[in-house]
């Protein structure tokens, strides 16, 4: 059985990662590349990078800030090593703790929380969600039975109502609530497949089995409206070459320039693993009228469990940084 999904919500496939940069705009890009030097049973190495870039009214570009995050986690997803540029020595307090359950609470309790609104904090905040999906990179490199043997803890986990795609009655689930593991994958349009050397920051390009989370947020102002155009892609390498897209969304939004409140929020599913996943888009109206700056917390409160997609939620939570990005727009952008 499957839950009906309106035709207009069904994913349309992977797309170009970025439009031409708009004069008078600010663009944030981040990437998180995961590798496993000693194989699936070994440590996971994260190379995270980010940049804020302003495109001035005359089309020239100014790098506002760059950041990087390095992390090593063990097979239990416990943080073994962590470091960043700019250097935040207090991050070392996260070593020995989980990169998933409780991570964001512990991060918020450190002085690193003062970096909120920056590319570095975006990378730090993204650790649990990106870590959660990273192991999916291996599914095309192993026979599925062998993969599930190695991931026995995941195979037997009850997933009912964890998210929209796993809601009760979803075709993603076995009758006992475990996953069917019949997932849709689509060829990924590489994020660098755009005719602009400055479209993205310089990111890692590891070989072999890798997973990448890539994000882009473009911000500009026209009259009384803040405009947002965003992109989100989880992708992994394939044994035969190229990449597959695992989760991919685009999104546009408008907010009031004076108050920062959300006027419109329109996510578009591009690639998702299960038939019911796109239904999460129908629930984003719950965020209308909220200040952008409150989205990081409000998304988790209003779109939890079967009301939301974990990855779309992460995409929308990042819009809390739009007011900070808008502060760096060139003066002419609103004229």
Predicted regions and their residues:
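Active-site- and interface-proximal helix/loop "cap" or "latch" segments in soluble metabolic
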Residues: 2-190, 236-335
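Long, positively charged binding patches that form subdomain-scale interaction surfaces
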Residues: 169-245
């Amino acid at each position: 059985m499957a839950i009906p999904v309106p035709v207009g919500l069904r994913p349309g496939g992977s797309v170009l990662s970025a439009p031409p940069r708009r004069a008078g705009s600010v663009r944030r890009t981040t990437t998180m590349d995961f590798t496993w030097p000693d194989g699936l049973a070994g440590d996971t190495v994260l190379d995270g990078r980010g940049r804020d870039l302003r495109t001035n009214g005359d089309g020239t570009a100014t790098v506002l800030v760059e950041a990087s995050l390095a992390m090593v986690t063990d097979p239990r997803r416990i943080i073994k090593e962590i470091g960043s540029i700019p250097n935040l020595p207090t991050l070392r307090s996260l070593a020995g703790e989980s990169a998933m359950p409780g991570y964001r609470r512990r991060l918020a309790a450190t002085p690193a929380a003062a970096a909120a609104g920056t590319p570095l904090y975006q990378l730090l905040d993204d650790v649990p969600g990106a870590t959660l999906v990273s192991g999916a990179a291996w599914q095309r490199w192993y026979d599925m039975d062998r993969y599930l043997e190695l991931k026995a803890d995941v195979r037997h986990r009850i997933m009912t109502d964890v998210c929209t795609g796993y809601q009760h009655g979803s075709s993603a689930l076995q009758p006992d609530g475990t996953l069917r593991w019949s997932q849709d994958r689509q060829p990924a349009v590489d994020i660098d497949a755009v005719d602009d050397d400055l479209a993205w920051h310089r990111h890692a390009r590891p070989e072999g089995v890798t997973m990448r989370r890539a994000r882009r947020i473009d911000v500009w102002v026209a009259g009384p409206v803040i405009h947002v155009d965003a992109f989100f892609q989880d992708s992994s390498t394939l044994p035969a070459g190229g990449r597959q897209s695992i989760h991919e969304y685009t999104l546009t939004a408008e907010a009031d320039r004076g108050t920062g409140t959300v006027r419109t929020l329109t996510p578009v599913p591009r690639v998702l693993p299960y038939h019911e996943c796109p239904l999460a888009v129908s629930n984003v109206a719950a965020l209308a009228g909220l200040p952008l700056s409150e989205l990081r917390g409000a998304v988790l409160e209003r779109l939890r469990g079967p009301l939301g997609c974990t990855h779309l939620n992460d995409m929308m939570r990042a819009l809390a940084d739009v007011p900070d990005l808008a502060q760096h727009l060139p003066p002419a952008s609103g004229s």
